[in-house]
Every structure is written in C-alpha cells, then in structure tokens.
Amino acid sequence: MVTNLYQNMRANALADAELRRKAADELTCMTARINRGETIPEPVKQLPVMGGRPLNRAQALAKIAEIKAKFGLKGASV
C-alpha cells in the first residue's frame, strides 16, 4: 500500500492533499477487505538485498574499463 502510494506520488507529482486523499481511499479499501473477512497477505520486502564486498581498486578499475569498452566510450583502456 505504501509503495503504491509512493510510486503514484512520484509519477504524478501529487500534492500533500492529493496524497492524503489517495491514502484515505487506500485505507477505506483495506478496511472493507478486512471487514469482508478477507485474509490480508504478509507484506513483501521490495528493497533489493545488496550483498558482497566492495571492489578493491584494481577490480574497480577493471570494471570501469569493461563498461567503457562495452559502450564504446573514450579512454576504454585503463
């Protein structure tokens, strides 16, 4: 629910009043679902899990060179 509101706010440049109205509408819909006895699923994490260790200097430079070569950018050799 929050993610949808946030995406809508960003995509449509909603003002505070519009966002509050849409949040109230979402809460009304959620209340109706609960009152009907519908089971509400557990929230799903949508943030990616960032893993791994940072690259060392040599690995970082190699990665930059790879990206430059892939896209044909100037200075492809490091």
From Swiss-Prot:
Protein name: Putative protein PeaD
Family: Belongs to the phage P protein family.
Other comment: Encoded by the cryptic lambdoid prophage DLP12.
An annotated GO BP: DNA replication initiation
Pfam families for the chain: Phage_lambda_P
